[in-house]
Structures are given as structure tokens and as C-alpha cells.
Amino acid sequence: MDVISDGEWRRIHYLDEFLLRVGGHERARRFKHNDEVKTTLVVTGKMQRGDPLFVDEAEFLVKHTDCCTKFALPSPFLIAIRKWHEDYSSDAYPTMEHYMEHLTELLALEARALAQTGIDIIQLDDPALTYLCDRRLTEQGQTQDDRLKREWDIDRQAPQAIAAINQIAGELPVEVQLHCCHSVHKRQSDVKGDYKPILPFLQDAKIDRVNLEFAYQGTGESDDLTLLPEGIGVGMGVVDVRNENIQTVEGIELIGAAGAAIIDPSRIALNPDCGFAPDYGEPPSIDEAYEKLCNLTQAAARLRERFAD
């Protein structure tokens, strides 16, 4: 493994962990997700700036490894899409854009604090950008998640999301990556679609790498990489985390090689499609995650040898 995180097994949920610490959110909004009625956090009051939230976790990671380290934060656009609702939030933040502006400010402060701990890579997680790739959702309003029933406009929302990312990433002295998965929950994906709709918008993104999913149908396609802007690398998600099936080394290598046939192999890294960390869903076992990562590293070694200069 060339890059590691702390695994995030400490967390409650990759959004809620942040939101519960900044305050202003209540578990009050009921919605239906895959025929299951849930109650989610929604912003109802002003968030508060305080001490950095995740410095202790980052320092622990840096202290216990000599490897390149990564720490992930949720993106402002993702949080705003899911956690602002006019029926609950308007008194605190009149519009979703007001909420998103404050989120961006708080996350920029957090990212700068993390960079000072010695973390090498800061990743912003933004499945909401991938929502814009699902034509069924954006054109027909088809979704299993009530929170996504809204007006979608890629020409307005993609630049909005990237502007927020740039405010966070712009002056960081570390590598910045963007992760766009298909919103995996309980081993199911909320949306489907290749990445062709959003990749051209990354031309203006102040990121070093974008991490995408390619391991199962309904996600990325290798020819998506023809639209990857110059100067940005790609993390090809080549391991499916949604089920217990263990992909072979050869199968993983095949996906990576398809990408290397389109762009310079030096621009490609391999990674799992999405995270193995638990949340309110059904996490994989440690043994499953370990075996999948072992096959991933073997495939990466074979590809390095295959495409060596």
C-alpha cells in the first residue's frame, strides 16, 4: 500500500461526524430511502467555529506510519444537497447557498489545520457531483432517495460545487484529491452513470487527482478518461466494495490496463471504488477488506512492471 488513512473505523458517519461537531443540526427530517423510512440530520441553527475537529485523528495517523497519508473530508456541495431543507433550515440559512458558503469556510479552516499535522493528501468526498451523472435522476427525477428529489442543473451546480472545492483546496500546501463515488449505502449504489457529464467541469478544479469508480456496471467507463483534464491524475476504483465477492488479481489488472491504454499510465493510481469504513449501513468484515486490498496491491505491482519505462 502506497497511501493509507486511519481506516475511519472510528467514525459514526462521514457527514455526521463533522456536522455533530460544528453544531446547528438536528435529527428531524424524515425521508424514504430504498423503501426504508429514516430520520436524518438537517441544519436548523447556525454552525459554530471552534477548535479544529480532526487534528487528533490526523496526528495519530502521522505518528504511526512512515507511509504517505491521506485524510478525507466531506465536500460543501454534498452536505448542502443532503442537509439543507427549506422547511427546517431557512431561519438559520435563508438559502442552500448561504449554508454552503458557511460550510466552505469551516471546511477550509479544517483542511488547513489537517495540513499542518503532516498529512500528505487531503481528499474531499463528493458523491453529489456524481448525482449529476445519473440521467434518470437529472432528467426524469427517478430516485430511491427522497433527498434527491429536487431540480438538477449541471451547468449551474457543477461550477458551484467546484468553486467551493477550490476555496478549500486553493492554498493548501499538500496534495488535494476529489472522490466521486456513486453514493454506496448498505452495499447498494444510489445513482448510476458514467462520468462523462462532469469530467469537463474539472478543468477549473484545483485538485491533483480525482478518484472514480470503475469496478462494476453503471459507474465509470474507461473511455471516460478521454475527457480527463490535463494535469489531473485519476484514481481508478478497481475493487467493488458493495458485496463479498473477491475480485481476482487478473480482473483488477484488466480494469487498470484499460485505463492505461487511454491515458499515460503515470497518471493512474488504483484504489477501491469506495470506502470500507462502517456507518449506518452494513460494513464489510476486516477479513474481506484485507483480502480485497491484497489483490489490489498485487494487481498494481503487475501493472507497474507491465508499463515500466
Question: What are the residue ranges of the model-derived segments?
Answer:
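Domain-level signal for soluble alpha/beta catalytic cores
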Residues: 1-309
